[in-house]
């Protein structure tokens, strides 16, 4: 396992919206044990530096945290809430401006609302530490006396909604007709949440899901380590001498004395056997250790469960009994004392990964416990307020009447509806495990999929929900700012201790009608004998008014994606390994493209590594503007599901098929956009390796995105390897991290789900005993007529006919090469090259290192095909294609028939250089950008200009641009699969036997290497239901969080009494769930008739009836004279006239993702948003941004805009837009003058400030302005970021918005309307 820091490119990726929520752990003395990374935004000190320091140094009231801890120690049955002010010292860069003696920099203070709970040690039940969640104090306009000051501050604007609901209750004649609360769908967990609690729920929900993502990542890392150890164990069977290494360090180089003492007396074969057994035993120990940890599943609370009403809150179980046993077993494991460096490194890395997962689960457990406790206390307070309000209004119905109540049993359908999540019933017989054996996460429930991202915490900081059985009376000593959450401004008539909290926690009341639970669609038939009749108090009124809608616990299985959450509309396209379906999400009506892959096909065709790589790449680019987005990933027993953007513009192969060739002016823009996308990928260490027209998709705006990362390689590029060679003996790949999985301080193992140092490419064994291979190249995985074929032979011996052979027919044990092995490389896979034959680089065919230069070669092939209509090395057979590539025999057409500029020819020749070191782009991307072919291209704002061709689908569901490729035959199969619950129910039965299988397989040990290998494989099979693919689960939290934030803003606007729609961030299109109809994009194009642009793969197929890539001269001439377009108008007309054309050619893609088509934005509420209408003041992004002044803007005063940037030419488009909106624009490029201008007496209407200035950041400049009393202290400020690399950087709270290149006119207009029209 290679330890390394995060890649610098990832440091700026902070998830939107969660930056104002801080997590803090304090020991009982008030010292900091842990602080979330974003806490440094308040303190100015990094989280690592903050660890160990007293919390008293942070707060203006030095005793407030200690007083709160004392109250928690006295009685931890409730949380404690405090208000404090934390001051931030000026950073070093701000001191640059402290040159004028008259100017003093003021410190930034933040008033925080802090809520803490006590955490107890699971072994001793003694207090261990406290957990705090801090957030800025929410200002409220109205404080309702009937609600109470403290609850008003906690709920923010939700308190006004609650007060409005209380007013409604006063008009209700009886308790039988109490109105339910209005609810809002949480996009993160898919629960309907009451509107007054929605904002608070969003914060807690995001905390839980980000912690869950970290736990998932940690599990992925551990699972890859286990696979690497298993491969090492298997390799012992294939060697005469046990010569195995881990991360380049030989294993068993230093033998124990028991083996060395008998070395002389034993024969060589006997000694080798002893060494082999010794290594095998060590590997088996490490594998057993990882299996124990992998068997521990994510903690979560089920939707409903059978419980007693008097069950204490502390007895909530978040782990299954089996997971508790595995947890105790894992914690009891000790590192063996070994002198051998290789084995010691192996055990240390394994132990670090195990602890990383345990710590991640531990922290997730703490957050779940905290969230549920806080939620229950808030609900308890609201419950009491409502009951008192009804009693005061004179209801005669008693609230404490004793009546028979039926306790509903576990709803198994709710707990098994997802193919990923399984809830183990609480009535399962518990194993005989003593409290000493059940360690820190002993109170968690069971989840089917292995937990999964990473947090760093010392494992001694255990979590437990045990607390003292004695409930002390509440005291309120200490600081006057300290207050109990259960102390309301009005007295609570019936403090139900933790009973009502547990009632709501377990969903008691779920048997009520759908009016109380409008979000619940799943019901379970109730058998009379399954109920238990008891005498209990009458249910609280909250159950009658729907308050327990709030009780939907955040981490339940309902929040996990499942195919049953979607309506399958129709198939879009069918490929070799699966089918893409147009689908609508049931809860929101949004449109997605779901890629469905059959597991059996993926395994038999050796595509497991490819689909893993594709998911990993997409996860790392949640909001990339260059890559089609992945929203969800999940699996069932038989299928994998990738929920993607639906890009109804088709792909470039469709465009080529309709036009035959693409005009050079169009090709210039398209190639430039693809080049920017490749630059983005290469900076992240990602090599696409399958660039071709089929994998270049077109959005609704006509701009391009890359797709199909099934053949991608993730790791160091050759240039990165050259830079690192000589510095370290072991080369480590760059670290990646999904913005969803925000890391914590101390993540020193690996912070990424992408690059796993413990994959098989990280270890090697000696190849001396292996048979030397003499082939020039090995060929594998081509698709022809939906058939995967594989051959391994030399280029000279390839037969004239393309041969087929089983995928796994030849398996070679070899030394994996870190420089050329693709991510998730299977240890027994044959050495191979990957890609589509027509676009393969010569170094790929020769079997040499494949680095990022192969993508530039492929881009040259794409440019050639754009201009001439066929690939440059096209031939009748794949063998001849390979020969042409190696000989650099480019099939140039007659340039008189296909006129082309000298610059285009030079660019093609530059890309198609056989020597990678002479190929264009070898030095850097600037070689390409500065080429004369791209003269006139503004690389900084290319995406802001109108595309050459803009698709015009007739409806949001229009798939006329796609070739179904026989997908219609799969529609019935998919429908039956989705509608049948058989597969899901079967999935949930698998893990019922895991615990017993694991325990049975762990007894005893075989000393024979083959037996050990077989047993370790059985370990894996018993431990993971989805062993081949691992925990295939993912949510794009960045997009879902933004949807929640938009909903919150909408509620706020409604409360304020005026309509205010916050413009969405342009880099993700319109946010899912946004009320702004995304279908407005189609409005101005409805008069155009879309062309039917069917897809044809760009791969070679000898059976094509009308091959697009033929270079027959007569065909070229005929096409040029009859079908060739003569002008841009003719091109567009030609596209429109092809709407009803039919192409029957079958495509032959090179990877399973050829059929992936995506859209720039999910489209919601299609039935109500179509036909489309653009409201006044909501101009379509497709309209000209300079056409008119924003009609929604009105101001009687002159508008002044100040632009502070270092390079004026980068933001020329912004200046044009502002001037078109009648602004007086002032521009400052000198950084010192920026501060003086802002501090002067002239007041501006709006400020645009660049963040990444040369000497000091724009954040620091604005800090000084905000802390002063100058005229622009409160002037709205927009942050400017020159590149899309900063796309995931959070907006500093002092800014009012953010713009990045290319400037989005629609977003700018929204900012102007919101900030300058007051």
Curated annotation (Swiss-Prot):
Biased composition range(s): Low complexity: 462-479
Signal peptide from the UniProt entry: none
Keywords: ATP-binding, Cytoplasm, Kinase, Nucleotide-binding, Phosphoprotein, Serine/threonine-protein kinase, Transferase
Start and end residues of each Protein kinase domain: 566-934
A single MF term (Gene Ontology): protein serine/threonine kinase activity
Principal subcellular localisation of the protein: cytoplasm
Subcellular location: Cytoplasm
Species of the source: Schizosaccharomyces pombe (strain 972 / ATCC 24843) (Fission yeast)
Keyword Oxidoreductase tagged: no
Catalytic residues (positions): 690
Regions of compositional bias (Polar residues) in chain numbering: 972-1000, 1091-1115
Lineage, broadest ranks: Eukaryota, Fungi, Dikarya, Ascomycota, Taphrinomycotina
GO BP term, pick one: intracellular signal transduction
Residue intervals of the AGC-kinase C-terminal domain: 935-1044
Gene Ontology cellular component annotations, sorted alphabetically: cytoplasm; cytosol; nucleus
Disordered: annotated segments: 431-485, 968-1022, 1058-1078, 1091-1127
Classification via SUPFAM superfamilies: CheY-like, Protein kinase-like (PK-like)
A Pfam cross-reference name: Pkinase
Compositionally biased intervals (Basic and acidic residues): 1116-1127
Binding site for ATP: 572-580, 595
This protein's encoding gene: ppk18
Top EC class of this enzyme: transferase
Reaction catalysed by this enzyme: L-seryl-[protein] + ATP = O-phospho-L-seryl-[protein] + ADP + H(+); L-threonyl-[protein] + ATP = O-phospho-L-threonyl-[protein] + ADP + H(+)
Protein name: Serine/threonine-protein kinase ppk18
Family listed: Belongs to the protein kinase superfamily. Ser/Thr protein kinase family.
Stretches assigned to the Response regulatory domain: 1200-1316
